[in-house]
Amino acid sequence: MTNEGLKLPSYSMLDLEGYLQPAGTPAQQIAMKNLAWTMLETYRTPDGGLGSRLSNEWLGEQKWYVQIIPHHQIMYEDSPWLLPLCLTLQEMRVFDILGTYVSPPAEDKSTVWQLKIDREQIGTFFNNYRMGFHLLYCQARRFAIHGNDGDYAVYAGSEKFIRAALPPIAVGSVATAKVIAGIEEEHGPGCMDGILEHYAPFMID
């Protein structure tokens, strides 16, 4: 059977078919998934599992910055933090928003969704993938938002993008410290040390 005849697994918590649209044929979705992985790498999580994160090589090549935020702030259809993101994407004229599951070992073949610039759709995407690693991006790779198991998300792109797409209180070292403190309170001290070390060269002060 060719890829044209396959229906790719979505790995979402709920069936999103009919609410979000697949980004083309299975073959086209696989191509879009491969594009996502040009920005990512796999790594060992603190519990010994295999996860994904934004690649330092990609971040450095693109001269991108990152900002870690609480995942719950973007996973509801009326999340206020999604409003500046939608406005920023509209101003950037980025209309081919894509979302997909990026938890290994499902690196290559899983549904890639086509999303509208809409708080309800974007919030629903982040909510339904909160139990794994997931990525919101566009075909031109002008930005990326990487979600991690419902604990946190990483906004990545130009400093201008990050500052425009998030509330001012969500940007900078003080905001990052608050996010880390909340995660460590739940999962234990030091659980974020590896992630902080990985993203340190690209964080906004």
What do these predicted regions represent?
Residues M1-A153, G157-D205:
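Structured alpha/beta or helical-core interaction and ligand-binding surfaces enriched in interleaved
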